[in-house]
């Protein structure tokens, strides 16, 4: 056995070994078969990972004072903080880039959906139109399926590097770059340099952040950065920047206005900025009506069937979804935990995966209940439907929710005393 003279060093060594053991167990958990031919436990691995989080947190609580004493001796300047966050972003970009490019080079991508976007970018380069022959087995504009003009913003890069690998790296870049608005928001709310780095780590280590890239590029990957920049611009009262990032957010997809609308509602009811909140609400409602009208009139129609469990007739639509929410809220609430089928537990696993890692900093709003408004899309868009992929962290449907969650987390941490903030933020980083 090793003899370590100082008790604090012994504690830190213990924590390091425990945390390494937890990480190895977590990796092994993904290769374990949680059942047999007759029964498969869909949340076995999720529950296993949760238990590992508890073990890691208990180990941290035992050594937290020693860890905090070490970090208290580290004093970072503003410039050094930016450098550290930049390094975090670059490493995250490299990780996502390597994983997704490896998927492409090893023929692990599927035609649906990576083949669609790889062909679409080549068609954009050659013809200027956002068309594919893959998406619906005929030459068709992607606008017929999703109204996503945001794809054009990355076209200049594809002109220079016209390769399918570039398409994957565009996604990696857009998912890594939100560390910039996260740092800007942290500094605006006067979080310490170390706390700003911790929040950046919470973002990049959050399971759904990297998980959302594992089904390859989708337009959703653009929105995290734009929504966070929009929140920052509104808080700083930078009108030009707010307009630019609001427009860019809306351009991501026909359902993107929902998230801008929620931001507007939050600014209105939290009394942060009623005027700009109302503007966001009105602008997003108008854009939503326009985008859905375009897809419905000139395309194949918006994919409202994903909310089919809220229809009361077979050929329902969004109107019936709203009617169900208003007329039968009890039924609507029951759908939040209703799984895809009777033998599935996908929503339970999804809720655990999304909430456990950030619960320590997400549900500490005190009496500022308006912040829970930022969680409404998580409930309405991801949990209400029984469409399987909407509540799966390995698909792209969480990027908008992640942006709103990170914003709420920053607001919550800003209201905490320094000791509580350090403890809870570190717990979230560990998980």
Model-assigned labels for residue ranges:
Residues 116-141, 149:
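Extracytosolic helix-loop segments that constitute the early lumenal/periplasmic catalytic or substrate-binding loops
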Residues 165-190, 229:
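Transmembrane-helix motifs of polytopic, lipid-linked glycan transferases
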Residues 1-2, 335, 346-372, 376-379:
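Hydrophobic, aromatic-rich transmembrane alpha-helices
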Residues 181-184, 202-205, 220-246, 263, ...:
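Specific aromatic-rich, kink-prone transmembrane helix
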Residues 1-98, 193, 276-279:
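Start-transfer (signal-anchor) and selected internal transmembrane alpha helices
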Residues 199, 228-233, 240-268, 282-286:
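Membrane-interface alpha helices of multi-pass inner-membrane proteins
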Residues 211-220:
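Short acidic/glycine- and proline-prone juxtamembrane loop motifs at membrane-interface regions
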């Amino acid at each position: 056995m090793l003899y370590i003279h100082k008790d604090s060093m012994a504690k830190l060594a213990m924590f390091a070994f425990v945390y390494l053991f937890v990480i190895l167990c977590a990796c092994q958990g993904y290769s374990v078969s949680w059942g047999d031919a007759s029964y498969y436990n869909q949340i076995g691995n999720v529950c296993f990972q949760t238990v590992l989080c508890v073990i890691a947190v208990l180990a941290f609580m035992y050594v937290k004072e020693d860890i905090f004493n070490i970090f208290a001796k580290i004093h970072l300047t503003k410039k050094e903080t930016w450098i550290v966050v930049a390094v975090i972003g670059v490493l995250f970009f490299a990780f996502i880039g390597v994983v997704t490019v490896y998927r492409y080079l090893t023929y692990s991508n599927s035609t649906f959906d990576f083949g669609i976007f790889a062909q679409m970018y080549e068609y954009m380069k050659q013809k200027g139109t956002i068309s594919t022959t893959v998406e619906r087995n005929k030459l068709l504009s992607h606008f017929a399926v999703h109204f996503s003009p945001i794809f054009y913003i990355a076209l200049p890069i594809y002109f220079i590097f016209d390769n399918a690998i570039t398409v994957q790296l565009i996604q990696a870049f857009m998912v890594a770059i939100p560390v910039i608005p996260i740092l800007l928001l942290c500094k605006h709310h006067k979080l310490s340099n170390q706390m700003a780095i911790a929040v950046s780590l919470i973002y990049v280590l959050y399971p759904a952040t990297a998980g959302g890239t594992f089904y390859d590029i989708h337009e959703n990957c653009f929105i995290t950065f734009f929504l966070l920049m929009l929140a920052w611009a509104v808080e700083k009262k930078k009108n030009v920047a707010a307009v630019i990032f609001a427009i860019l957010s809306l351009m991501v997809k026909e359902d993107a206005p929902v998230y801008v609308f929620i931001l507007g509602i939050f600014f209105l009811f939290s009394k942060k900025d009623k005027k700009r909140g109302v503007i966001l609400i009105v602008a997003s409602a108008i854009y939503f009506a326009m985008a859905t009208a375009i897809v419905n009139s000139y395309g194949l129609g918006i994919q409202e069937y994903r909310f089919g469990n809220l229809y009361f007739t077979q050929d329902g639509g969004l109107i019936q979804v709203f009617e169900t929410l208003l007329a039968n809220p009890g039924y609507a609430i029951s759908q939040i935990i209703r799984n895809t089928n009777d033998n599935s537990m996908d929503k339970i696993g999804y809720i655990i995966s999304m909430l456990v890692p950030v619960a320590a900093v997400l549900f500490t709003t005190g009496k500022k209940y308006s912040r829970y408004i930022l969680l409404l899309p998580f409930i309405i868009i991801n949990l209400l439907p029984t469409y399987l992929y909407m509540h799966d962290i390995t698909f792209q449907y969480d990027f908008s929710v992640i942006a709103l969650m990170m914003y709420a987390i920053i607001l919550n941490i800003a209201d905490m005393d320094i000791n509580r903030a350090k403890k809870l933020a570190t717990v979230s980083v560990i998980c």
